[in-house]
Curated annotation (Swiss-Prot):
Lineage, uppermost ranks: Bacteria, Pseudomonadati, Pseudomonadota, Gammaproteobacteria, Enterobacterales
Xref: Pfam families: DAGK_cat, YegS_C
Organism: Escherichia coli O6:K15:H31 (strain 536 / UPEC)
Main localization (coarse): cytoplasm
Amino-acid positions noted as binding ATP in the UniProt annotation, renumbered to this chain: T40, G66, D67, G68, T69, I70, N71, E72, T95
Name of the protein this chain belongs to: Probable lipid kinase YegS
Source domain of life: Bacteria
GO CC annotations, alphabetized: cytoplasm; plasma membrane
Active-site residues, Swiss-Prot/TrEMBL: E271 (proton acceptor)
Length: 299
């Protein structure tokens, strides 16, 4: 068997009792692969483990968890300086796994682990909000953000991505649109937004394709706004094709500025960020990620 450089797996603490994962790691170790494992307990652990990974000289840091774990690890990687920065590997173990699903990471743990270690490392973009917080997949605002933020953990654990839809249906009568103004390159819109999606990736909220044209290595962010005054009529209208849908506004830009007269909340790969002013910009070729050769999000 070919020799591969060492890897370090940063595993979300919720997945420590995953027996199939333990077995998959043991099998690869028996085949001669060096895989270090570190468990996250609190915010900031991922950044510390990335520092350790660099000292160990590993070629890949694998994010084992959901979109939030991938976000933490990728953010820590793009903050590294110097040469020989490890590539990002992805092991989908979260509730929705939106980014992993959209880029074509296998669901089978053994296949995903092998891809994370031996896959081709490709330069991909990330996005940054207000020069501080980053996201690798998507920033969502409005209805979708409130649903993903408020969905109970027990419901997510039991039903996965479907839980977001169920909780959303339960809350429809209480949700109102957000008034805001959005600017970008050759783009300007203002009005009432029920859902805002700004994507480096394509899907969020357990498989909802909010930005179906997004690519992760084109230097652009994709914007999609669902407009309207009432939730149910707007959701019904989304069943139409995009060309016939007056409730969908789309744009593409390397940056977007968002202003609101009141505080609104964006969900950045699962982490909420509230405010009235947001500057979101793309960071081209910010890190290398091990992806399948047929990844649909590459140009």
């Amino acid at each position: 068997m070919a020799e591969f450089p060492a890897s370090l797996l940063i595993l979300n603490g919720k997945s420590t009792d995953n027996l199939p994962l333990r077995e998959a790691i043991m099998l690869l170790r028996e085949e001669g692969m060096t895989i270090h494992v570190r468990i996250t307990w609190e915010k900031g652990d991922a950044a510390r483990f990335v520092e350790e990974a660099r000292k160990l000289g590993v070629a890949t840091v694998i994010a084992g968890g959901g979109d939030g774990t991938i976000n933490e690890v990728s953010t820590a990687l793009i903050q590294c300086e110097g040469d020989d920065i490890p590539a990002l590997g992805i092991l989908p173990l979260g509730t929705a796994n939106d980014f992993a699903t959209s880029v074509g990471i296998p669901e089978a743990l053994d296949k995903a682990l092998k891809l994370a270690i031996a896959g081709n490392a490709i330069a991909i973009d990330m996005a940054q909000v207000n020069k501080q917080t980053c996201f690798i997949n998507m920033a969502t605002g409005g209805f979708g953000t409130r649903i993903t933020t408020e969905t109970p953990e027990k419901l997510k654990a039991a039903l996965g991505g479907v839980s977001y839809i169920i909780h959303g249906l339960m809350r429809m009568d209480t949700l109102q649109p957000d008034r805001c103004e959005i600017r970008g390159e050759n783009f300007h819109w203002q009005g009432d937004a029920l859902v805002i999606g700004i994507g480096n990736g394509r899907q969020a909220g357990g498989g909802q394709q909010l930005c179906p044209n997004a690519l992760i290595n084109d230097g652009l962010l994709q914007l999609r706004i669902f407009t309207g005054d009432e939730i149910i009529p707007t959701l019904v209208s989304t069943l139409k094709s995009d060309e016939d849908n007056p409730n969908i506004i789309e744009g593409a830009s390397s940056w977007f500025d968002i202003q609101a007269p009141h505080e609104i909340t964006f969900n950045l790969d699962g982490e909420p960020l509230s405010g009235q002013n947001f500057h979101i910009e793309i960071l081209p070729a910010a890190l290398r990620c091990r992806l399948p050769p047929d990844c649909p999000l590459l140009r």
